[in-house]
């Protein structure tokens, strides 16, 4: 992946906000840019990384050895169910701080698409993670392929993303520009 190196404008803005006990939403339009940004974030982290990959793109890069990280624990729903992954994540962050990357809200909705209450389940899972991250001095990044319509962040399927004042919102636009929304 290094041959197509991307420099992110305003990366320091994101880096300054990734502090212990914080949760952030990362909105993106281009999945490749999201992976490049996550690669840059993780390369600068000292914390062990827990990556929950529900859209399988990151897993593909790791399995094909296009991305290598020594302090990475990767979870995906090809190998485990969401209800098996969550207790493992919560146990790990209760023992020591981690950088937790939840990729993505879109993938979680797809995983739970047969559940009538998928919206409530998705919001409950994300709030459970955010709350536990705050207690454990971990850092949480939740990614979503989303767009803004009438001041609300919406997934491509039209579902509105639950927003929380304690979660910072970062947007990757134009493939390499990072902005923060208050």
Predicted regions and their residues:
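C-terminal regions of RecA-like/P-loop NTPase motor modules
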Residues: 1-7, 177-182
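Pre-Walker A adenine-sensing motif
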Residues: 2-21
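Short amphipathic alpha-helical segments
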Residues: 63, 112-114, 153
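Conserved catalytic network of the ASCE P-loop NTPase/AAA+ motor domain
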Residues: 16-19, 44, 67, 91-95, ...
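Conserved nucleotide-binding/hydrolysis micro-motifs of P-loop NTPases
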Residues: 56-58, 78-80, 106-108, 146-149
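Conserved P-loop
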Residues: 19-89
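Phosphate-binding/switch region of NTP-binding enzymes
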Residues: 131-182
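Phosphate-binding/switch loop-helix module in NTP-utilizing enzymes
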Residues: 77-136
């Amino acid at each position: 992946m290094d041959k197509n190196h991307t420099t992110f404008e305003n990366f320091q803005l994101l880096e300054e906000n990734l502090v212990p006990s914080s949760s952030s939403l990362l909105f993106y339009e281009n999945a490749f840019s999201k992976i490049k940004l996550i690669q840059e974030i993780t390369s600068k982290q000292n914390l062990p990384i827990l990556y929950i990959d529900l859209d399988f793109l990151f897993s593909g890069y790791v399995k094909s050895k296009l991305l290598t990280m020594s302090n990475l624990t990767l979870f995906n729903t090809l190998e485990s169910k969401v209800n098996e992954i969550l207790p493992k994540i919560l146990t790990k962050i209760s023992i020591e701080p981690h950088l937790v990357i939840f990729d993505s809200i879109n993938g979680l909705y797809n995983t739970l698409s047969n559940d009538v209450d998928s919206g409530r389940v998705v919001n409950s899972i994300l709030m459970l993670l955010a709350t536990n991250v705050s207690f454990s001095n971990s850092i949480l990044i939740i990614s979503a392929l989303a767009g803004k319509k009438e001041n609300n962040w919406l997934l491509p399927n039209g579902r509105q993303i639950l927003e929380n004042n304690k979660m910072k919102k970062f947007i990757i636009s134009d493939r390499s520009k990072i902005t923060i929304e208050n």
